[in-house]
């Protein structure tokens, strides 16, 4: 089955919470590893306070399960503490995959 769906989540840390957000994202890797429908999962930092997650799925059921799963719950459960603004979560269609 081809990987055709993804999620891009862009996160802006509150000042002074950059390390805590990075730690949360690192710890989420173990949760992503337990999701068989999440075929690709990356957490990244793109600036001093800018972070994100990119993940990919074979089908909508996998993407929905991920959005309703433990990583989303962990992130949203600490959003007020760690994030300067609500997360920018975008569903994307993958046009080409290597």
Regions found by a protein language model. Name each.
Residues 3-4, 22, 59-62, 97-98:
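N-proximal accessory regions
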Residues 8, 25, 54-56:
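Residue-level detection of beta-strand scaffold positions
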Residues 10-22:
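Short, surface-exposed ligand-recognition loops at beta-strand->loop->(often short) alpha-helix junctions
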Residues 14-16, 46, 58-60:
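Short coil/turn motifs at secondary-structure junctions
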Residues 19, 49, 62, 66:
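Active-site-proximal flexible loops/turns
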Residues 27-40, 56-90:
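An amphipathic, aromatic/His-enriched active-site/gating alpha helix that lines ligand/cofactor pockets
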């Amino acid at each position: 089955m081809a990987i055709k769906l993804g999620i891009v989540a862009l996160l802006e840390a509150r000042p002074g919470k950059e390390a805590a957000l990075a730690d949360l994202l690192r710890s989420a890797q173990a949760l992503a590893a337990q999701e068989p429908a999440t075929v690709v999962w990356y957490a990244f930092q793109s600036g001093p306070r800018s972070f994100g997650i990119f993940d990919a799925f074979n089908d909508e059921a996998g993407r929905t399960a991920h959005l309703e799963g433990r990583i989303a719950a962990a992130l949203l459960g600490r959003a007020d503490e760690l994030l300067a603004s609500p997360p920018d979560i975008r569903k994307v269609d993958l046009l080409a995959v290597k």
